[in-house]
UniProtKB/Swiss-Prot annotation:
Keywords on record: Ribonucleoprotein, Ribosomal protein
Name listed for the protein in its UniProt record: Small ribosomal subunit protein bS16
Keyword Transport: no
Gene: rpsP
Gene3D superfamilies, per database record: 3.30.1320.10
Family matches, as SUPFAM superfamilies: Ribosomal protein S16
Presence of the UniProt keyword Ribosomal protein in the record: yes
A GO molecular function held by the record: structural constituent of ribosome
PROSITE patterns listed in its UniProt record: RIBOSOMAL_S16 (PS00732)
Amino acid sequence: MAVRIRLKRIGKVKRPFYRIVVADSRTKRDGKVIEQVGKYHPVQNPSFIEIDSPRAQYWLSVGAKPTQQALALLKLTGDWARFCGEENPVSRVEQPVSIEAGKSAPKSCRRSAPVAAGEATPTVSDRPDLPSVSDAPQDVPEDVRGQA
């Protein structure tokens, strides 16, 4: 039985998600699989790639051949280099940052100075650098000038 590591498409129209699976080469793309070894979400920015490295290494060692797309993902995660025998394979996939329950969000994720309940929010009239309605050209009808 020829076994392949390939992508199984799931998701909605124009919102694809893929599972990296081990399947018989004769089955359909989205057909029965032997084992799921990872996930790939190309729509997210940056793309999400997660591969169960020990299981992928096992299937590669017993002769499973990856498709071109699966091979590209295995190279990104460093699993292909590890299978080929490189000593220090490097993964070019960033690990997702998780925020634990007790910790606060990173500084880049925090909102700047929250507005208190009694404070007024700034309006357009508070900004002198923005043009006002009275600065509109005079040849424009009044009903158009009043709209913003």
